[in-house]
């Protein structure tokens, strides 16, 4: 497998500088193996790389929907009985495939690549292989402090009773957090009040008896 990829990469590198050497590398690998179509994008007959200048590509489409076939489809949908000839025409229409024709300009041989039939595509549309539930992305679960405390207590069941007794419950943890937040806000408020009083004292000095006499 590694040798195959190495030879294919070397052939694509040599297709402009030495196309004969590129064809020889592909032919040497294909001749030593039973499967002739081992390389994609190459001619299975002469091992020529099917690039734009050395190949011709055509598409043979599926047969179009005619009024006769549409009438047969409507009769089949209504569960009407069809004759052998009509059923054969309808089966041929459903099993029809698009064909990609690639002609190699070196050996003038054509390679056919068949597509999927109408019946397969209709079945694929009606019964998708990948359900929509798998395609939906899962939202990550957010852990709250209460859930973390519950997980901690559940994980500490196998420990000693002293450790289990010391683990606070969710209500106690919330009350402790609220008391800590209240003390922090009171401390910040007192500091702000002290700063404001200092600034006011700097702007308005104390009116003692000496200042009062000097103002007169």
Swiss-Prot record:
Modification Phosphoserine, positions: 126
Compositional bias annotation for Polar residues: 124-136, 145-157, 167-182
Region named Disordered: 118-185, 197-216
Stretches assigned to coiled coil: none
Basic and acidic residues composition-biased segments: 200-209
InterPro entries membership: DUF4674 (IPR029779)
Pfam families reported for this sequence: DUF4674
Entry keyword set: Phosphoprotein
Modification type Phosphothreonine: residues: 130, 139
Family: Belongs to the UPF0711 family.
Protein name, UniProt field: UPF0711 protein C18orf21 homolog
Annotated organism of origin: Bos taurus (Bovine)
